[in-house]
Amino acid sequence: MKKMIYDSLKVLKKVTKRFEIIMVDDGCPEKSGSIAKKLTKKFKNIKVIFHKKNLGYGAALKTGLKYSRSQWIFQTDGDAEYDVNDLLRLIRLTDKSDLIITYRYKKKYNTSRIIISWIYNIILRFLFLTNFKDISTGSRLIKKDIMKKIKLNSNSPFIGAELAIRSKHQGLKVNELGIHTYPRTFGSGSSVSFKNILLTIKDMIKLFLIIKK
């Protein structure tokens, strides 16, 4: 995680002089919390927010959005699965976007995860009449103002899909950019755990019922 933060600092300095990095520790049992604390002491523009217990991927994202003060928010996971240098490509689309989501050029995962992701995206296209290529990636660029127009309810990994779907249904400009992904260098993925799959399905059904009213 430390390497990813240093990489992020390098990239952000190329983009703007005024920025902040917000890390949300969602009750993580690993050493990310102590690493984050050390980094906040070294860099004034880094802050860490702790959840006392694990509230879920979606809850962590909502916390980050709540405390962000910037006009544009680049959200990415802390396991280095995504290249923070993609931000340099994402910002080229800001003039014509309210939200920029990403899709994977090639999915470097095991077969079961690829199948789950494929089925997931097919279901979302069918239920919500969207044509997104891949709505489940954890890297996106969000215009802060859109949070005044949409309310996110999901605490599960469905949060990314909810953000894109609600934005689209509100008539906001949502664009996509292809990216490469890499093997995790920190932590372990939990999005495809049985518990998170059930929570994702639950949040998906809730959003479907809300939108179809």
PLM segments and residue spans:
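Acceptor/aglycone-binding surface of glycosyltransferases and processive sugar-polymer synthases
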Residues: 51-67, 72-74, 81-157, 182-207
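A short, conserved alpha-helix in the catalytic core of glycosyltransferases
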Residues: 146-150, 156-173
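Conserved donor nucleotide-binding strand/loop of the catalytic core
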Residues: 19, 33-67
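Short, well-formed alpha-helical segments that are part of the catalytic scaffolds
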Residues: 1-12
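Residue-level preference for short helical/loop micro-motifs built around acidic side chains
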Residues: 2-3, 30-34, 59, 134
